[in-house]
Amino acid sequence: MLMSDVEKFGGDCGSSGGSGRPTLKLGTRASTLAKTPTSTGGRTFMTVEVRSRKRKASGASPAEGVGYGTSPYTSDDNRQGQISRSATCSLTAREQLSRINAIHTADSISAQKEAAKKLRDEEEVEVAPPEGESVIDEPDSVKEPAAAADAVADVATPVLGDIAPGAAGTRPGRGGHDDKGKRYSYQGAGGKIKEKEGGGGVKKAAASRASSKHIKLDIENALSGTEERYVLMASSRRRGGSKSDRRISRDVVIPDEIEVKALAAAMAEKVGDVLRVLSHMGVEARQNTAIGSDVASEVAERFSHRPKVVSKIQMERELSDISDSGLALEPRPPVVTVMGHVDHGKTSLLDVLRKSNVAEKEFRGITQHIGAYQIDVDGKKITFLDTPGHEAFSDMRARGTNVTDIVVLVVAADDGVMPQTVESINHVKTAGVSMVVAVNKIDRSDANVDKITNDLLQHGVVPEKLGGDVMIVPVSAKTGENLDKLKSSILLLAEMLELRAPVEGRAQGVVIESKIERNCGVVATVIVQRGTLRKGNVVVAGDGSYGKVRNMFDDSDNSVEEALPSMPVRVLGLDKVPKAGDVFLVMPSEKHARDLLEHRAGINLSRGRDSGRNDSVFTGPLFSMDRPEGVNMILKADVAGSLEAISRSVAQIEHEEVKFNILHKDIGDVTKSDILLAEAASAVVLAFNVKVDAQARDLVRQKDVDIRHHRVIYDLIDDVKGVVCGKLKPIIREVQVGLLVVREVFSSGKGGTVIGCYVSEGAVSRGALVKIYRNDAVTCEGKVKVLRRFKDDVKEVGHGLECGVLVEGAKDVAVGDVIKVLEVVEHARVVE
């Protein structure tokens, strides 16, 4: 209920007519306040005229516009009635001020209640929870401040005629109430109305200050329109409090294991709040601590969310799912991988098919990178992958079979089936792909195709002419013989396989090779398996690489706008170098890409904790005194595939006395940080097809770091074996170079024993190591201290001569003993 505004105070309260009556101005709403002496006990009293402009008190009729009051313009009859009524409400000036303040306070509180109610009603209409989310109330502990704020609105509205018994004794000018739960209005130093709210929201110091100071109530400001603005401001603050009373309930996806900060982000809660809840649960954790799904679910429930536990496999499937449903499948070119033993002519065969000269550009004619090309054959496209034939590149060959449709196994007609040929056959069987055998070099005079066929039969490769399903095509890369037949065989097999893939939709494929180029950054060679890869797509590759495709190039270095299924392209724009063999996906946005990588990083972290090891970088101590001789190495290569092959080859060079520690391996040139690490750990830097950058060259000369450059993997592996051999202790052997027979024994005056001997085999020299045997048992061992021929000192005595020798430590010597002259020989150890 809203109280009437005070319109005017005035009139005369006694029998005098109104002249000489002092008035007190109260502003536009309170016009006059008359003070006049009366005849009743000489007591001063005032009369108040209250007019209602917009609102009226409950129970008043519309005609009631004037309340108690007197006026000099009223008639004598009416004046007598007004005087009689004013007698009942005649108050002192102090009491009138107290009553006016009470009216103002009640009016403000009622206005606040109505404004707050109106705002709450508007919120209920405007605020609606999103789909799948519900709005719930805060716990009681959160509602307490809002309840304390609303306590002011619950104060009973005072009526005009109610005055506390002690009101008459109130200090003049003291406005407001003494109850801390009410709202105080007083005039500050600047003349503005300030409000203080009691309860928990008012500090004790402020309350003490308000009670100790003599605060005058400025009636003009208290009843002016500025109060309405304060009411609205208070209502606005209350509206903000009402929003905090509500919380959004979410569906929180929780994996098998999740970090605390990730859980807080999923619930849209503060990390500190989550940690406090965990502490109350008895779980000591930090923001990077991983907690189980059961604990995370309980935390989510305590925040009134709905936990949904999913496995890591299921979450991976949901994040990386690319649905092909509803997409049309269209024919795609076959992906053909050329495999075989080293130097059997794989790259030369591809050069003839592509009409290129890749083999001439390769150092010493050896393929050490996997290559991807696409050619046109009779209007149809074929994608070829060229894999290295060296045994160190077995992982590359395995990746080739995993992304291919057809394998062309190249076997040299003059060399036959070799170890890498057999390995390639096993890869084909494991992958379950179709195969065509190309018997190359049939132009050689010693070519024997029938022998090749029989050798293949021993490894389970049955040709068509013997009832199998493998086509064998004799070809010559040098003369071009039967190349058309080989192309036709590939196209026929591809037609039989009915290769199809969706062209529309998000792209997915495999990383074939990756490297860092000086002017381009990270470059990844990929093959699209489905969908269309376009410039500007956000791509995730493997577990830690993502980015937006800035540019794409085909195998002829032409920039392309899009890549269709089975098309190999070089992609620029990734932030890190992906691993060869990683699967790449096109994601809807960078946020989706980061979410997928964070999930995969969490899986890898869990696997690392379970296994307790990290294969990428050596994390053990650099120096230790209680371990075998170690060789610290830093590997730098031009592409990811070569780095992988080198790491695998080095790991296979094992010896019980020497341990390899790969401190760091990376793609790109040797940098300053590599040199500093090599110096600190006394490491050998193996640089494969890379250079030393400008900043590191001067540092190499200063630090004297051992850097070994190689362009062929054969040489690198042999060099590593040489490093191992240099760390191994040599084999020490004693070789017999002479044999002496004791014929006389003389006692020397110096306390030694002079032995008269006959050299029956070889020779004896001064300083030689000798062992004295008696009945095949060693009685003494030492070096020849003195060697004489008759009375002359000599350096050496040969076969068939007599001599006298003095052996260090020889005392027990008898005639007939045998003295063997030995030579210590060190043999370097060889690692196979």
Curated annotation (Swiss-Prot):
Region (G2): 365-369
Keyword Cell membrane appears in the UniProt entry: no
Annotated spans, G5: 476-478
Compositional bias of kind Gly residues: 11-20
Binding sites annotated in the UniProt record for GTP: 340-347, 386-390, 440-443
Keyword hit for Cell inner membrane: no
Subcellular compartments: Cytoplasm
Region of interest: G4: 440-443
Listed PROSITE patterns: G_TR_2, IF2
Region (G1): 340-347
Domain tr-type G: 331-500
GO MF annotations in UniProt: GTP binding; GTPase activity; translation initiation factor activity
Keywords: Cytoplasm, GTP-binding, Initiation factor, Nucleotide-binding, Protein biosynthesis
Compositional bias annotation for Basic and acidic residues: 1-10
Annotated segments matching region G3: 386-389
NCBIfam families found in the cross-reference section: IF-2, small_GTP
PANTHER family referenced in this protein's UniProt entry, alphabetically: TR-TYPE G DOMAIN-CONTAINING PROTEIN (PTHR43381:SF5), TRANSLATION INITIATION FACTOR IF-2-RELATED (PTHR43381)
Entry similarity comment: Belongs to the TRAFAC class translation factor GTPase superfamily. Classic translation factor GTPase family. IF-2 subfamily.
Free-text function comment from the UniProt entry: One of the essential components for the initiation of protein synthesis. Protects formylmethionyl-tRNA from spontaneous hydrolysis and promotes its binding to the 30S ribosomal subunits. Also involved in the hydrolysis of GTP during the formation of the 70S ribosomal complex.
Record protein name field: Translation initiation factor IF-2
Organism lineage: Bacteria, Pseudomonadati, Pseudomonadota, Alphaproteobacteria, Rickettsiales
Name of the gene: infB
